[in-house]
C-alpha cells in the first residue's frame, strides 16, 4: 500500500481519470489530477510533491503525454512516468524508446496490473 506518496494522473477521459484516481486513493496514495498536458505540466512545475506521473499518451491540445513528461523532466529529472497507451498511440513514444524510470501500460489493462505496476515504480528509488 501507499505510504503517502503523491501521484499525478493526467487523462482527458473523465471516466478513466476517475477510475485511476479512485484506485490509487484506495491503495493509500495522495492523488492530483489534470485533464490535459498544460494542466499536468502546471502541477509538475509547481512546488507540489509528485512521486509518479501517470499519463495518457494521447492528450488533446498542444502537448501529448510524452511531450509533457519530457518538459516536466527538465525541472524534475528524477520524475518517474507511467504512460497509459492504446495500441495506436505507441508511435508517439518514439517506437518505445523510453528514458530511465519510464514504463508503458497498454489499454485495456486490469486494475490489478495497474496497481502492481504503480507499486513497483513508486518503490524504486533513484
Cite the ranges covered by each PLM segment.
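Acidic di-acidic motifs
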Residues: 5, 11-12
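Two-component His->Asp phosphorelay active-site signatures
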Residues: 12-14, 110
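Alpha2 helix of the CheY-like receiver
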Residues: 17, 38-45, 70, 115
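Alpha4 helix (beta4-alpha4-beta5 surface) of REC/receiver domains from two-component response regulators
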Residues: 63-74, 78-107, 111-120
Amino acid at each position: 500500500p501507499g505510504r503517502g506518496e503523491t501521484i499525478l494522473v493526467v487523462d482527458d477521459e473523465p471516466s478513466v481519470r476517475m477510475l485511476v484516481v479512485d484506485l490509487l486513493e484506495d491503495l493509500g496514495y495522495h492523488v492530483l489530477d489534470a485533464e490535459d498536458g498544460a494542466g499536468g505540466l502546471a502541477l509538475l512545475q509547481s512546488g507540489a510533491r509528485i512521486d509518479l506521473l501517470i499519463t495518457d499518451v494521447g492528450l488533446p491540445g498542444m502537448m501529448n503525454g510524452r511531450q509533457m513528461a519530457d518538459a516536466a523532466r527538465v525541472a524534475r529529472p528524477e520524475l518517474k512516468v507511467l504512460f497509459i497507451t492504446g495500441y495506436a498511440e505507441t508511435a508517439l513514444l518514439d517506437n518505445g524508446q523510453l528514458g530511465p524510470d519510464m514504463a508503458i501500460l497498454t489499454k485495456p489493462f486490469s486494475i490489478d496490473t495497474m496497481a502492481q505496476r504503480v507499486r513497483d515504480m513508486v518503490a524504486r528509488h533513484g
